[in-house]
Amino acid sequence: MKLENQSDFYLLYKPNSWTSQDLCTFFKKKYKFQKVGHSGTLDPSAEGLMLIATNKYTKLFDYIDNTHKTYEFEALFGFESATNDTDSELVEIESINLESKLEELDKGISGLTGNIKQVPPIYSAVKVKGKRLYKYARQEKEVELPIRD
């Protein structure tokens, strides 16, 4: 299939353990595109569909409403980790009131609609001064976390 000169949008599945850039690089090399970009970043441990643009269409991302997203997740109660996910060692919490945790989760999720302000976790791909936050975290360097819409 000859696609290298085509400008278009694609929905591609990003598997667990790949970075968003890994997916773009693979797609670009496989079909010999001049330029490939993505509309947002998924964590390496996340999997799902990503909107990918090729060639001239990469410039159109500025005009795409990127606010309507749906997330599915699985939660593991009774553990905590330095990275707030399963990428670092899980430490079991002595005791947990599952009913109150489910109520907390319900309250938290109900507030995640519309335009919201968030402070990203230190282990995230958000950039501060051109550097990903997780790199500051791995180097144990303090950095001010940005508030984002």
Question: What is the meaning of each model-derived region?
Answer:
Residues 1-149:
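Catalytic/RNA-binding core of pseudouridine synthases
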